[in-house]
Each structure stands twice: as C-alpha cells, then as structure tokens.
Regions:
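Solvent-exposed alpha-helices and their adjacent loops that cap or buttress functional pockets
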Residues: 121-122, 147-149, 169-171, 187, ...
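A charged N-terminal "starter" segment
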Residues: 1-174, 178, 207, 211-217, ...
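General structural feature for long, well-ordered alpha-helical segments within catalytic domains
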Residues: 33, 49-52, 56, 60, ...
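Short helix/loop capping segments that flank catalytic or ligand/cofactor-binding pockets
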Residues: 89-91, 112-113, 165-166, 269, ...
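Charged (often Lys/Glu-rich) extended helix/loop segments that serve as interaction or gating elements
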Residues: 293, 297-420
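Structured core elements
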Residues: 101-103, 129, 154-156, 177-179, ...
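Active-site beta-loop-alpha junctions enriched in small/polar residues
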Residues: 52, 80-88, 105-109, 133-135, ...
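Active-site loop/helix belt of alpha/beta enzymes
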Residues: 1-10, 169-173, 182-330
C-alpha cells in the first residue's frame, strides 16, 4: 500500500511538473535544491526566481503576436508591468530587461521611473500608463514627467474631475486616456466599478472637454475586469461592450488608437492548474477584430497590464515547522516559524490559494494537518477555502520539529515546507 507523501502527490497530480521535481526525497524548485538554500540562509525565507519573470513576459508576447498574425490583426501589442505588484529593484530590473512598458498607481511610482531612467534602465519614449485615483502629488508628478520629455505618458482619467486637475498641471502637449466604469461580476458586492467614467457619459464628456482642448489627444480607452481574463460569459460580455464603445468613440476621435484590456492572466496557484492561455489570447484578438470589422473601424493597438502574472509565479516562501499540536481527534496543527498575517496576508485576507509542498521527507507517510502562524490572532492560519483549510504533509516525528528545547536539531530532522 502506497502511503508515502511522494505517492500522494504523484498519484493526485501530474508530477513532476515544470517548476517542481524531487531528488533524494527533497524538493527542487526550478532546478534549485531548496534544502541547500535553507541550510545556507535558514527560515523563514522568501526567494525570487528571476528567470521566471522574463519567461512569463516572453510567453505572453508570443501568444499575442501569434494571435495577431493568425487573425490578420492590424494593431500592435504592448506589454505593461504593474509596479504595484512588486517595487523591488531586482524585480524591476528583470522586468525592464524585456523592454516592457510601465503602469503606475501612485505618485511614488513616478519617482521610481525617474530613478530607473537615471540608471539607464528606462527610456523616455516607453509608455507610462498612469492609472488609479490621482491625488495632487500624483498629478504634479505626472506633469513633471511630461515637462521632462517623457513622450508617451498617458494619464488615464478615472473620473471627470481629474481632467481639470491635469489641465491645470500640464502645460505641454500630452496624450490622455479614459477608463470605462465596467460592470462588476454579478456576485460582487457592487454593480459598477468605483473607478472610471460611465458608458453613457464617455462620448459627451469627450466632446465637451478633450475634443475642445488642443493640448490633449485622446489616445487610449481602458477597462479593467476585477476577475482577470477568464473564459466566462461575464468577461466576454464586458469585453464586447468596451470594444463597442471604442468603435463609437473612434468614429469621432481619430487620435484614439489603443485599447487597454486591464485585468491580468491567472497564475498557477495549485498543482492541478489548467488554463489555456493561447486560446484566450486568440479569442480576445479575434473578438476585438470582429467587432471593429463590423463597425468599419481600424483595430486598436492592444495594451495589457500584467502584475501578478509577471511576478506571481516567481516566488517561494519557505518555513520550518516549529511544533505540532493536536487539539482534538480531528485537528492537528503544524506551527510555522512565522505569521501568515504578515508574511502571506493574501492567504487569510482574501483566501488566496497557494501551492504548498513539503521541502524534505517525501519518503515519509503523510497526514492531514492545518498550518498555523506564530501570532495569538485567531485568523493567523492558512485559510484557503479551496483546500478546506487543511493540507497534507509528511508525518511529524518527535525529532523532526524544532522547539526552544531542541536548539541543536539538525536540518534533516526538521520538517520544512514551501508556499509557491
């Protein structure tokens, strides 16, 4: 009877996988022996595998470029990275190696762009898509970029009042965009996005303001779907509505030539993850082209804003199991050497699921456990509804957890886990 942890994983999922394989009962992540990393640096530890960032960027580029070629689509594709997903210098350095553009969300992001330009990592003709609600400092920083010769700064109007603020702050010619207030998913708490301008107001607003102002050119129409790019009736309906608005606006605004399809690709958060990126990309391009052809409008350049997709599959967080506690005959707790609330807040705040795997002891029998954090807060545990809050891990023995009473425990005697 196969009751080992490695048997459970290999029989439940297709395993090994692209990112994961096991040698000598220890987990390798993208070819990296995680136990060697733990022995050198200890836990808790977060690592980033930078090549995965470039790999995902190049994959998305390839999918869109192939889809554009197959559909005989006349527009271009532009990949934008959302800085809010990770501001770390080493992440931005890796991202910008791929010649991508930047999407910003705050005044702070503008300061980062200026530093990146000073370091020779960002060109002044790269696109800078300025999203988010804009406080005055953000407005002023955008205006400073324009006056400093950044030629493709595109502030996206999230409300009508921002137009007057930008008009006062910016003195030089500038491209501009409008965000559509998309309808939210039916099960969401609200009907319409809090950001953006309503469908029915966009054309009247353009004609009464931007059209009359020679300083601004309406370059881009932007919509954002909270659920991301998914094969659902809701997503395709919102895409269709937004492209139709684009066509109506293009007929009276010749400068308009770009559609920003906000909301990113999903990322791999479970070993059974299955998503057809190529199909979705081809469908997006095909549907935009079909609607534009029907309306007699030239296809727009396509911009995407990928944050989580860019960096979400490139990180691992490694923990030690400090102690095991049995509270009753059904609940067995493995206590990690950190806090989920501070280290992985998405796991408890929005029930974000992660791939959880043992780093060592794959030859041991497995058991069902709950993962708990160090703090006294009752919510400090791995709280993924998709996993029913419990995971399976190699059985803990008396010598493979570490406590204050066992300061000299060797690494091979301690159970380590990774969240990816």
């Amino acid at each position: 009877m196969r009751t080992k942890y490695i048997d459970l994983i290999s029989q439940t999922y297709e395993f090994p996988q692209e990112e994961f394989h096991v040698e000598d009962n220890e987990l390798y992540y993208n070819g990296i022996p995680l136990m060697d990393i733990i022995k050198q640096y200890g836990t808790p530890l977060k690592i980033t595998y930078l090549p995965r960032i470039s790999q995902n960027i190049q994959r998305a580029r390839r999918w869109f470029n192939v889809a554009i070629a197959r559909a005989d689509y006349q527009g271009d594709y532009h990949y934008c990275y959302c800085t809010k997903s990770s501001h770390f210098e080493f992440v931005l350095t890796e991202v910008l190696k791929n010649g991508v553009h930047i999407e910003t969300s705050s005044a702070f992001d503008i300061n980062l762009i200026e530093i990146l330009h000073e370091n020779g990592q960002f060109n002044k003709d790269n696109y800078i898509i300025c999203n988010g609600f804009k406080k005055q400092q953000y407005i002023d920083n955008i205006a400073q970029l324009v006056s400093n010769g950044y030629t493709n700064v595109i502030p996206i109007l999230d409300n009508m009042a921002e137009y007057d603020q930008l008009n006062k702050a910016i003195n030089d010619p500038c491209q501009i965009g409008i965000r559509i207030a998309a309808e939210e998913e039916p099960r969401f708490e609200f009907y319409t996005s809090r950001l953006g301008i309503r469908y029915n107001d966009i054309i009247p607003f353009y004609e009464s303001t931007i059209k009359q102002n020679p300083k601004f050119k309406l370059k881009m129409l932007h919509f954002f779907i909270n659920t991301g790019i998914n094969d659902t009736a809701y997503y395709w309906n919102e895409l269709s509505k937004c492209v139709s608005i684009y066509c109506d606006l293009k007929k009276i605004c010749p400068d308009l030539d770009s559609l920003n399809i906000g909301g990113g690709f999903p990322i791999k958060n479970r070993l059974s993850f299955n998503y057809d990126y190529e199909y979705m990309t081809e469908e997006i391009v095909s549907q935009i082209k079909q609607i534009c052809d029907r309306e007699g409008v030239m296809e727009p350049h396509i911009f995407t804003e990928f944050g989580s997709y860019t960096v979400g599959e490139a990180s691992a967080v490694l923990f030690s199991i400090l102690q095991q506690e049995r509270q009753n005959d059904r609940e067995l707790w493995n206590m990690i050497d950190s806090s989920f609330m501070t280290t992985l807040p998405d796991s408890w705040a929005i029930n974000q699921q992660f791939i959880i795997l043992a780093v060592n002891n794959w030859d041991r029998e497995y058991e069902r456990v709950f993962l708990g954090g160090l703090t006294c807060d009752s919510h400090d545990y791995y709280n993924s509804e998709a996993n029913l809050n419990a995971v399976f891990m190699p059985k803990i023995t008396e010598c493979n957890s570490v406590t204050d009473e066992e300061p000299d425990s060797k690494e091979q005697d301690v159970q380590y886990i990774g969240l990816f």
